[in-house]
């Protein structure tokens, strides 16, 4: 989402000194909207004013007293700037904050100004604008041919990750996974066209192309060494990761330039490798609804909604990251499961800790604001309140003995000394602003106390003076008031102005009153304002010093925040496991997936826990590699398949699972092809989307992957679809080609013929009870294939008119397609079993993956026949047209445009051909 900016012409020669200053600063930050501080407002001029007035819905005006050629302008009050700033940033704009760097009262001539910070979507620190449970990542991408260096920084928490990728597909998957608020990159990425307009819009990305100086290798190395204060990069784990080093240096340079800050809260850099986590592409994340629902993009109804019972924002972000990056290391998975079991065994102590976590604010983001020097007094009070109960939590942690919880106990610091410092210094009712005073408690500093007394005494003297003047003049409604323009003044209504004494000096005339000053009143004013001004300055200095002292403890605080996040996340998984009756899964490395009484956790939760039908699943790498699942729509096939994928994924994040027993073989990837919708924005039809996804799965899956395939081939004509579905199953089943564990739901009952022909394919169906013309879905997976699709009965349940139902029943009798099934029974498969020769034959005859990629997902007429039709030279295989007298039928078939036929049309034509051939005695 890169915003087009307007381009007004500016007459530089005729600018006033102030506008010339504005112009010079704006030139340096031409890609930003410049917030130019003038008194109590941030003003915008020219193009910035035109843009901001529309986005912020504020009035566009001109400076008072200016001529008609004066620039358009608009402004926002400084005390409410965050609201307007966030609106612009969330709309994809960058904003440069230009402050007055000297007191206007002391300035000789034009007040000095400079940009103190640039706020962008990836560098926003305002917690009110950020999603609590989600990281706000800035992503740096260094593209070198098909290799990529990736750096991810969450400025609001200090988290810093780097990795390297070796394909554009994996790059898009990482972007989809981390959902960066902003991307900075080298020119190569832009030129490559990998990030299409459709992808950028879909992901709501703000992208900035940086100059070479940001990402040159030598400059990047210097930047990283300087920031982390190291002599070599090997100790940071970056050895041999040249592209990652360039991307890390790139984001650090960008942050230093935009934030004008030391970034002291970014204290570690963590290399990660995609091979350490289960790979989930964007389609799978959406189809499994891990963090948001597919339709409404809501958290409610997602897997995260079920699992997230965290009490802190830090714990919620960590739990979300578990879902986004399931583990593939058995020891790491078992360690997480041990932590959950530890909490389950001591529920009373667990609930005590949970209660203490409840008032904890977002320590990670508060710490970032403290280090940025942007934390206000109330932020420090929130920090203090967050650490108040840390000693109580620390005292309970020794009751747990699992490895992870012991590690958290070691990391956990009570931070009692910091609590005492804040408690001793800051007023409990301190204001938001650091420039309003009333921040520091009485008794903390002698000079503060003396100045407060002077200010209070001065105000008392003013009050006494008011009473004296009333008595002296006889003006009973006389009032002494104050404003920032005139200071203290005496106000008298017009009805009493004739009684005003000669020693008063008139200052202002109003419609109904007059305002006056006296020498004595001015004397008191100087006493009060002098004390107040010094008081505000001193309070700010003391507050800033305290804030810096806390920032110096960043390592202790950061470790404690991470421990709190981990404890909170695992308590959440423990609470859900207990309340939802989840069980601890066994983890194996032999590729066995054995689930007893499995449930879909989200569907069960939405149903209120009652009536969900449990189902078993068994898959392995030998005789139970592929399950062909048949049955009518609405019967529960998709729910069953998704539930299996979710149970596997939950096990690999280290969670207990919704089943009575589960033995889960570690999967390196989960792919789903479930449902489709036309991608109109990119001009892709349902079938093209489907075939593209299938091609992606077959290219990127491995023997250790889990595939969830629903209705492959349904987006085209019956024969095309059946051909493709058959060929895909053949391909997956062959361990020399793929051999992945697969749940394959289909309406093509002909595919049930593959059981017995392929040694690792088994048929399952959804049990249905028939009651006359009505059916009842039992939601139970049973062995065997379905012999009916029950489409007409489902149509009846959906409310299709009776006349349509009756006509459909008549047509069904006429269009009985058993002949197709008989042909399927006589088909032989290619590449069956584990034989090398079978695999070789299949590849030589052009396998399905080549077919899909070469045709872009759309079948070629010759290829579609090769996928299912036997080799004509093989006498053991079936020949549909073995006689020359049927050449006219063959010609008709060859000329038929299958992609334009509906299933009904296809069956009608097939029926006509069959009658013609049978009439000739074949």
Regions found by a protein language model. Name each.
Residues 883-922:
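C-terminal tails and terminal domains of large nucleic-acid-associated
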Residues 427, 510, 514-548:
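Extended, charged coiled-coil "arm/hinge" scaffolds of SMC/Rad50-like chromosome-maintenance ATPases
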Residues 362, 372, 376, 386-389, ...:
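Charged, surface-exposed helical/loop "interaction arms" that form contiguous linear patches used
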Residues 46-49, 241, 311-312, 322, ...:
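ATPase nucleotide-binding head domains, primarily ABC-like/P-loop NTPase cores
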Residues 98, 121-130, 262, 398-404, ...:
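Active-site phosphate-binding and catalytic loops of NTP-dependent enzymes
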Residues 215-223, 278-282, 294, 385-460, ...:
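Amphipathic heptad-repeat alpha-helical coiled-coil/stalk segments that mediate oligomerization
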Residues 15-19, 35, 46, 75-85, ...:
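Amphipathic alpha-helical transducer elements in NTP-driven molecular machines
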Residues 2-342, 358, 362-371, 375-467, ...:
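Charged catalytic and DNA/RNA-contacting regions of genome-maintenance
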